[in-house]
From Swiss-Prot:
Gene designation: cyoE1
MF-aspect GO terms: protoheme IX farnesyltransferase activity
Protein name in the entry: Protoheme IX farnesyltransferase 1
Coiled coil: none
Function recorded in the entry: Converts heme B (protoheme IX) to heme O by substitution of the vinyl group on carbon 2 of heme B porphyrin ring with a hydroxyethyl farnesyl side group.
Length: 297
């Protein structure tokens, strides 16, 4: 009876929320960048449309699994307690079937409109996030988002391979940028939500090692990110426009990390977290703009 009542309360908006659409959109921006950077010619409309749709569907499926596995944790945290599974508006079994349908459709589109390598790399990313990170690493180690961050860093590689059909050094550099970005992004949020993570018994770095230690590591990773973000220019993958944008964006990120480390602002942690999202969005847009500027010179 409870299942029936929950099912009646569920709406299409609940299922959409399970896919973490804002996160998927950011991932698809990096996937688009990978696609366009992979070629000096245009990207075919079928790869552009169905390739990104396939990647997005698989990412959404992984997000749904994350909701299912974390539903009890989500119910304990103020940030997540209104999620559909945490509130019982969607039951676990229908959610898992929805995740499976998304993943199967996404894989089918990738196999039909891109290539097998893209499909299998996407599947590996999906399993890395949904199974390795969500099912094990998140509860096992304070380095959870460092190790598990590789799965979330894959979209530019997936976009590149969808167009080129092979893996090369350039898309791996884009993966490295997101990989270096992930720790300061999530640890800033973890500082802001430290008490909630402790209540849910999630070993995030601020919970296990304290805020000062975490702030130092945010600062160090932000320095690494700044250096890594300049590599596309160093290997002639991008030009002066990207270099200028990467420096401005990276130095601003470093300023946020320094303010957080010094403890001079009461809301520096959430400010750093929010800026990190804008940073990644703007950095990959700069990559795209610079790419087409170079093509038209």
């Amino acid at each position: 009876m409870a299942t029936l009542l929950s099912a009646r309360r569920a709406s299409w908006r609940d299922y959409l929320e399970l896919t973490k659409p804002k996160v998927v959109v950011l991932m698809l921006i990096t996937s688009l960048a990978g696609m366009f950077l992979a070629t000096r010619a245009g990207v075919s409309w079928s790869v552009l449309l169905f390739g990104n749709l396939g990647i997005g569907l698989c990412a959404g499926g992984a997000a749904v699994v994350n909701h299912v596995v974390d539903r009890r944790i989500d119910a304990l945290m103020a940030r997540t307690h209104k999620r559909p599974l945490a509130q019982g508006r969607v039951e676990p079994l229908p959610a898992l079937l929805f995740a499976l349908a998304l993943a199967l459709l996404g894989m089918a589109l990738l196999l039909a409109f891109t290539n097998a390598l893209t499909a299998w790399l996407t599947l590996a990313s999906l399993l890395g996030y949904a199974v390795l990170y969500t099912g094990f690493l998140k509860r096992a180690t304070p380095q959870n988002i460092v190790i598990g961050g590789l799965a979330g860093a894959a979209p530019p590689l997936l976009g590149w391979v969808a167009v080129s059909g092979h893996v090369s050094a350039e898309p791996l550099l884009l993966v490295l940028i997101i990989f270096a970005w992930t720790p300061p992004h999530f640890w800033a949020l973890a500082i802001h939500r430290k008490e909630e993570y402790a209540k849910a018994d999630i070993p995030m770095l601020p919970v296990t090692h304290g805020e000062r230690y975490t702030k130092l590591h945010i600062l160090l990773y932000t320095l690494i990110l700044l250096a890594v973000s300049l590599l596309p220019y160093a290997i002639h993958m991008s030009g002066p426009l990207y270099l200028a944008c990467a420096l401005v964006l990276g130095l601003r990120f470093l300023q946020w990390a320094w303010v957080l480390y010094r403890g001079s602002r009461p809301h520096a942690a959430i400010g750093t977290f929010k800026y990190s999202i804008a940073y990644l969005f703007a950095l990959f847009i700069a990559l795209l703009l610079d790419h087409y500027l170079l093509l038209n010179l």
